[in-house]
């Protein structure tokens, strides 16, 4: 049994004896696996209820299903999805679930030439010899910039967990324009932008991005490598505009996901390894972990006052956020709120009042009132745990929470394969002792084992409670079999009424994690570039040609469907060649490709875009450069001869 705590969880009131056979089987299998893990700690598995409330209504029975766009119609929402270990960001249309675009981020992409062109290599980062520094990535969490509590359409950010990088996407062109590698961090997992400045009321938009380091390491990572007790994690703040690291915080425990308050004063991360264990049994040994809060203004004041250190070769200021250094609330930089065992996920409610931590190994969600956290920092609250206003049971394996803007929360239950809809105010009343407060509103079976979820506009003050997307980690029998590797199952749900309605399944290539959904009118994408955006642009085909400077050769050419400005160009074996291509077409959707056989080169240029590649002409002969991206009825004739003389 879990040990008692002043905020011991309350139990749900909606148990019913009916559990569908498939989910009963999956519950049993999942619980058996959990029991094996928990047995390593000599502690029992947390109790909870997973009963379904009955068969869900079908999409055909529900009017909102008619909002699915017909051919030629546009979706009403954008969705930005992480790609997982494909290392990209994906753009979806909602509510159709149609994948519209993939934005290359941390790994090469042969279609667009990401990691091949000089421009993309500059963003990705290279070694001294010009090779890419990294060729793999693992994107988990995507979030966008804010103004006045809603998305402003400027930027989106996404993490790379493998190599601790933060990537930024310009939402006017849907391209990655900057990547920053975080110093002294491994397992960079959760991210979240701030929503306004904590001090200056005129700065009502995002200026910081907070990043959580999940894996503790020696600091620097060359000293004490055999002593896990000395490993530590860092919480990082990155400047939203320059993408430079502003500061870091040394903490006890680790970081998982990240949330920020709407007033800009607080950031937080849930912690599942306050034990700072190096083995998973140790990571589950404590009955309660923490939601760690950061007082942003105080941290930046400490940095400005010089109360920091640096680590290794990094020049980034690092302040002390450990328990020992933050005993006095009136000077503390951090506050550790106790939450049940191994939480997974912390989310900010759109009414700006609460952060909610889901329990994972506890069947509970913990509601933390932000005003009380600020009271503790001001010395007005006796104990930081008094900021907890509810801790209620939801079901087995709660992970992540979304909101509908009507006071309801939606939490994924991994072991139960369910979404539970619950009312926050009712949960608070129930926690205070009102046993008539029915906080569980509805349950819906999903297929199967849901991880992340998000609702339309959920993480803004404009949460509209229309659609919910759920990322199910296992698709099992939902799609045609294609061999051992299954797709993920993204399920879309109508949440506009009292009951949740499952609308559709979508197979998606492994392995997305988090995502956001927002109204399309918040974005104003440009579909044709400006020539002036590119310093290397060749603005007139007459400027095309070959310029030699010793062994270094520059080839300039333009493209206008269906031809390149140079029908052929000559090089000598051993030349270092920089080829610059400008697309002079001004027609939307008229993208050109450029491939050089046997030279491992392919890239595209969109209308009015310029891109370049550099390579060694090490193979003599004739090589037909051709357009790989269909652009004209004479597409196959769009070629140029590269002649390399021996």
Swiss-Prot record:
Catalysed reaction(s) here are: N2 + 2 Fe(III)-[cytochrome c] + H2O = nitrous oxide + 2 Fe(II)-[cytochrome c] + 2 H(+)
Cofactor binding, note field: Binds 2 calcium ions per subunit. Binds 6 Cu cations per subunit. Each subunit contains 2 copper centers; Cu(A) (binuclear) and Cu(Z) (tetranuclear). Cu(Z) is thought to be the site of nitrous oxide reduction.
The EC designation for this entry is: 1.7.2.4
Q: Where does Cu cation Z2 bind?
A: 140, 189
Tell me the residue numbers annotated for binding Cu cation Z3.
141, 452
Renumbered to this chain, region (Disordered) spans 1-21
Q: Which InterPro entries match?
A: CcO_II-like_C, Cupredoxin, EfeO_Cupredoxin, N2O_reductase_N, N2OR_C, NO_Rdtase, Nos_propeller, NOS_propeller_2
Which HAMAP family did the record assign?
A: NosZ
Protein name, per record = Nitrous-oxide reductase
Q: Which organism is it from?
A: Ralstonia nicotianae (strain ATCC BAA-1114 / GMI1000)
